[in-house]
Design a protein with these regions (language model features):
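Extended C-terminal subregions enriched in glycine
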Residues: 528-532, 567, 574-624
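Active-site rim segments in enzyme catalytic domains, especially the processed small/beta chain
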Residues: 175-178, 187-191, 195, 199, ...
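Extended C-terminal regions of large enzymes
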Residues: 369-372, 377, 527-530, 542-562, ...
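Short, small/polar residue-rich loop motifs at catalytic or cofactor-binding pockets
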Residues: 354, 464-467, 535-537
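Noncatalytic scaffold domains of N-terminal-nucleophile
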Residues: 10, 15-33, 39-153, 157-374, ...
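Internal maturation/activation junctions in enzymes
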Residues: 285, 292-293, 340, 389-486, ...
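Short, well-structured alpha-helical segments that form the helix of a local strand-helix-strand
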Residues: 164-169, 249-260, 330-333, 396-415, ...
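Short beta-strand scaffold segments in enzyme catalytic cores
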Residues: 180-192, 468-473, 539-541, 628-635, ...
């Protein structure tokens, strides 16, 4: 009680060698004003990364204009080399061109060929003992400032990037329990820059063995039947086994401290509570989130000793305590009391999938995102279609916006054909088509440059899912993006005696009676025992397609299928229009709603752009927010982490 006062699975070697650079300080970025506080709106928030501004695409000019401070580094000088998208390279990737000492080294090399040895030595000494140089060591971005601080703290203790992501993701389940938690699941995307390797760790929930037939599921299905087998803690443990550095018990102990010592209620949590309907009416839920019958207010100080005890237990006894212990029995009993069918075998059978991401090349970069049952192939398809259009800064704004809308319609329609490939082999074939550049060329021909077309999938896509986002770029040269969820806010609303809030992920399956229009479900996403539902949890990582130097990005979004639309637009802003990350996250976004054939645009969308769209036949619907997208960017040795400026709670920290 709060005190308010193998198939797809692959076996990978545990552990990962980490070459740690020195971290001298962890400055806190200034807290941002809540949404709407600034007189000029969200565009004023672009100043958050003003120290880079356009320089995050031109680090050399930044170096020349700043007094630089050199920090010790354990990496050798850096260089570039050509590597295939998913091939490992043993050569030190940072041995030349990527070094921010590039200009100095050029001078040294020239001097070595021109002057005597003594002059050369003098020049080398000047570089090493003259004006110091600045390196950014990492970045952490999460939906809550408390969790961002925890992530940077883990890096300060020389934890790996994955360690920081684990602690931050578990923290998010404490501070924003409506969006994620131990009773949910998600997906993690990990990229090793040095080895040019990527892993998707899929810990999405699965349907229980006793799930009713599709025809027996109704709109008013009992909340217990909406609960899938949680995967959150096993997913974090698998990630730690592969890429962790600090002890598991230490990571969970640090997270438990957040619950035990307390935190302030976020605006997002308070908003979710204020919008609650009668679904969440159990006595235990009321005690936790609606004390005295009133929702918690922003800033209210809350402690969660119940979750602290659970995390300490999992840290000491491992994940077996969750999947074959007293916690298991609690979850089963609570689900049964709410009409569910979970049994012990569901927990003992649960496993995490480790696989490679799907990827494409776009504007000289590789883009990685999760494979099915996640909608990554649909995101890739959108980029492949857009790449064939003549999109430039000087081109027609109206054409670009129209192409974007029509492309997203196609991508979202394709996504309705995805599901768990382990239960339907056709999904693999479908996904391969979405990844094809030639197929994208054919789909591009379907777009009429002057007129909108109507497209409605036979079953609705997940559009309102709450989710937590964590992005980490650490000094070990790993990039990590995690998106976790309970599905709709507060999941099923079922809370165990230990304080675990359970998910409602069965809603992400397709079943005919889920909606009022009784749309026919697609077979690839039917609810069947042991299957994972289709997902729009889309952590996305970008790196240069050739060599090691250039722009690296990490992005994640929330709000179901709207995350796909928003991530695509941010990628185009950065990679096509060469905008800096701050501006790319701030710009207005759009999302086509296929069921209603309307086009949602957020409050930052310019009226001039709306006029362009209306002229092409689009029916525009203004909404406050389409999706929140956070980002982290690395350009050579410069790293910055930024939250979506629409969020009053999220925080990005750049580590020097």
């Amino acid at each position: 009680v709060p005190e308010a006062v193998p198939g797809r699975q692959r076996a990978l070697a545990a552990g990962s060698p980490v070459d740690y650079m020195s971290i001298t300080s962890f400055p806190r970025l200034p807290e941002e004003e809540p949404s709407g506080a600034a007189e000029s709106g969200l565009r004023a928030r672009k100043e958050e990364d003003a120290f880079l501004g356009e320089q995050d695409t031109d680090p050399d000019s930044f170096l020349k204009s700043a007094r630089l401070q050199r920090l010790p580094s354990s990496s050798s000088e850096m260089g570039s080399q050509d590597v295939s998208p998913l091939q490992e390279t043993s050569k030190d990737p940072f041995s030349g061109d990527c070094s921010c000492r590039q200009d100095g080294l050029t001078v040294i090399i020239t001097a070595c060929l021109t002057f005597a040895t003594g002059v050369t030595v003098a020049l080398i000494m000047q570089i090493y003992f003259g004006d110091p140089q600045l390196f950014h060591r990492g970045a952490v971005v999460t939906d809550a400032a408390r969790c961002t601080a925890l992530g940077t703290h883990v890096l300060a203790r020389r934890g790996s990037s994955v360690d920081a992501a684990i602690a931050s993701a578990l923290c998010a389940g404490i501070v924003n329990p409506h969006a994620s938690g131990l009773g949910g699941g998600g997906v993690m995307l990990v990229h090793d820059i040095r080895k040019n390797r990527s892993w998707v760790i899929d810990f999405r929930e699965v349907a229980p063995l006793g799930i009713p037939l599709e025809g027996d599921l109704q709109q008013d299905t009992k909340p217990g039947l909406l609960v899938g087998v949680p995967g959150m803690i096993l997913g974090m443990h698998q990630a730690h086994q592969l890429h962790g550095r600090l002890p598991w018990s230490e990571l969970l102990g640090l997270t438990a401290d957040v619950a035990q010592n307390g935190f302030n209620v976020t605006h997002d949590l308070a908003k979710a509570l204020s919008e609650l309907k009668e679904l969440n009416s159990s006595e235990r839920f009321q005690e936790l989130f609606l004390p005295a019958g009133q929702p918690l207010l922003p800033g209210t100080f809350v402690r969660r000793p119940d979750l602290a005890a659970v995390l300490q237990l999992l840290g000491a006894e491992g994940v077996a305590a969750f999947y074959s212990g007293n916690l298991t029995q609690e979850m089963i009993s609570e689900v049964h009391s709410h009409g569910g069918v979970l049994v012990e075998e569901d927990f003992s059978n649960y496993s995490v999938t480790v696989e490679e991401p799907v990827h494409t090349t776009y504007r000289g970069h590789l883009v990685f995102t999760p494979p099915p049952p996640h909608a990554g192939p649909a995101l890739i398809s959108a980029l492949n279609i857009l790449e064939g259009f003549n999109i430039t800064r000087q081109g027609s704004r109206g054409n670009f916006l129209h192409w974007m809308v029509e492309t997203l319609k196609i991508a979202l329609s394709l996504a309705s054909n995805l599901g768990d490939p382990s239960g339907d082999e056709s999904v693999t074939h479908t996904a391969e088509g979405m990844l094809s550049k030639s197929e994208a060329n054919s789909l591009r021909q379907l777009i009429n440059d002057s007129q909108s077309f109507l497209s409605t999938p036979p079953s609705p896509l997940a559009s309102g899912a709450a989710a937590s986002q964590v992005l980490v770029m650490g000094p070990d040269d790993f990039i990590v993006a995690v998106v976790s969820s309970l599905n709709r806010p507060f999941g099923s609303g079922i809370v165990t005696p230990s304080g675990i809030l359970l998910n409602s992920q069965i809603l992400d399956f397709s079943w005919q009676n889920k909606t009022m229009n009784h749309s026919i479900p697609r077979p690839p996403n039917l609810a069947e025992p042991g299957r994972r539902p289709r997902s729009f949890l889309l952590p996305t990582i970008v790196r240069p397609s050739e060599g090691m130097c250039g722009t690296y990005l990490s992005l994640a979004g929330n709000h179901g299928d709207r995350a796909l639309s928003s991530i695509v637009q941010v990628l185009v802003n950065v990679l096509t229009f060469n905008k800096n990350l701050s501006e790319s996250l701030s710009l207005g976004r759009l999302h086509p709603q296929l069921q209603s054939n309307t086009l949602q645009v957020d409050s930052e969308f310019p009226e001039e752009d709306i006029a362009f769209l209306v002229a092409r036949g689009h029916q525009v619907d203004k909404v406050p927010v389409v999706s929140l997208v956070h980002g982290a960017r690395r350009t050579n040795s410069f790293i910055i982490g930024l939250k979506d400026p629409r969020s009053a709670d999220a925080a990005g920290a750049t580590i020097l």
